[in-house]
Amino acid sequence: MTGFLTCWDGSEYQLPQLYEWRLCYGLGSPCDSFEVCALWDGVRADLLAQFTRFRGVWKDQTVFTGVVDECESCRDGNGTRLMIRGRGMAALLLDNEAVGADYQVATLDDILRDHVTPYGITVGERGTFPAVSPFSVDTGSSEWQVVE
């Protein structure tokens, strides 16, 4: 797998060859997670605090996209290693507070438009859901709670 990290300014950095990776898909929990490890020369350590997104690519296909929660470098007798940990894009829904709102009628499109896509999350396949009337979003609830 090839790993790419994106900084807050949109610049992208390709990780050195990964020697270990773990992708966990939630299967019912609200958030997927990842952990990747690479040998690292320590150059550009100043970038570590600027990474916000991770993208894992396998055979030219993106297999994971997520939010970087933690970057750690460790040096020992075997060299310097870089470990990146984080969560899937749903983490943005868990971490952000929804603005309170009352909908007379809320469709799936309304909910996705107002509470999911503003965080850069795109929805691939989706089912059909009937409109909900009325629908209220409580101030202080997470965006995940709105979608759930």
Language-model segment annotations:
Residues 78-81, 85-148:
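Charged- and aromatic-enriched interaction segments used to assemble
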Residues 1-102:
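Assembly/oligomerization scaffold segments
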